[in-house]
């Protein structure tokens, strides 16, 4: 008689396992069969050691059948084994996403994605957006997101996490990525600088001409010897915006500075000199002179 022992450790889906068969005569022919655990024995099917690699995750029974030889009777032995689900992701798995400028989000161009090998069985991936690298604080309306964890709209650095559901042969997995929403470069329109000296303080102001609908601003101006947006005397000035009051917009040095002028006021003179008699002292009356 032949006393057989078969060893097949559990293995992960896609890996090549090794069958260890002990006790078989050296000149015997061995055939391996398998079935799903607890299925009827009539479901046994032939399989090779290489074929085990293609089995889906699950629990099975392996049967080793040793055919009869000249000196030994045939024999068989069974052993249960498990094919574990594989992990398609790890701590280095990344989400691909292209950042954008505030106000220019494109649902297709800026949509997150993952490599196909991270989702080999094409599960529906859920993407959630966060404000921190640890992905613990979801985006909110403060970031311009319509829902918690939704796509942010406001300028800043954000993170996105892909959650890949468990499938037939793969464990659930995650991947992360980071991107930036850059501030929108502001373009300024200034109030008229066609100003003339009138003895009073006069000023110029700016507004953002490429603002998105609904956006508000509180502009601040620099005031020192070099820059001012308020003047009284007739001369040339430079105004400079130093803050827009809206973090979703940026302002270049070139765009922030504006040259303006208070022109000299025209003088309209009137002189009155009545006729007078020789030897008399006339009086000249000059009107309109500063």
Name what the model sees in each region.
Residues 1-290:
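Solvent-exposed beta-strand/loop surfaces, strongest in extracytoplasmic domains of secreted
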């Amino acid at each position: 008689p032949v006393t057989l022992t078969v060893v097949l450790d559990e293995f992960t889906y896609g890996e090549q396992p090794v069958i260890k068969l002990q006790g078989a005569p050296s000149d015997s022919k061995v055939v391996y069969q398998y079935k799903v655990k607890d299925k009827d024995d009539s479901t046994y099917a032939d399989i090779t050691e290489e074929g085990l690699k293609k089995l889906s995750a699950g629990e099975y029974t392996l049967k080793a059948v040793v055919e009869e030889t000249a000196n030994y009777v045939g024999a068989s032995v069974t052993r249960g084994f498990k094919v574990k689900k594989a992990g398609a992701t790890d701590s280095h798995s990344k989400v691909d996403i292209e950042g954008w400028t505030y106000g220019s989000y494109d649902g297709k161009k800026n949509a997150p994605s993952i490599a196909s090998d991270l989702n080999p069985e094409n599960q529906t991936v859920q993407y959630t957006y966060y404000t921190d690298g640890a992905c613990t604080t979801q985006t909110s309306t403060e970031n311009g997101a319509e829902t918690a964890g939704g796509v942010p709209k406001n300028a800043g650095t954000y993170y996105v996490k892909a959650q890949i559901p468990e499938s037939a042969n793969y464990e659930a997995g995650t991947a992360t990525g980071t991107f930036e929403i850059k501030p929108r470069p502001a373009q300024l329109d200034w109030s008229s600088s066609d100003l003339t000296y009138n003895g009073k303080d006069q000023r110029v102001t700016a507004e953002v001409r490429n603002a998105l609908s609904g956006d508000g601003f509180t502009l601040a101006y620099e005031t020192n010897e070099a820059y001012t947006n308020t003047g009284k005397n007739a001369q040339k000035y430079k105004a400079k915006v130093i803050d827009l009051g809206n973090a979703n917009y940026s302002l270049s040095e070139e765009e922030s500075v504006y040259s303006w002028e208070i022109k000299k006021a025209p003088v309209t003179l009137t002189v009155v000199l009545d006729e007078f008699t020789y030897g008399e002292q006339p009086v000249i009356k000059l009107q309109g002179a500063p």
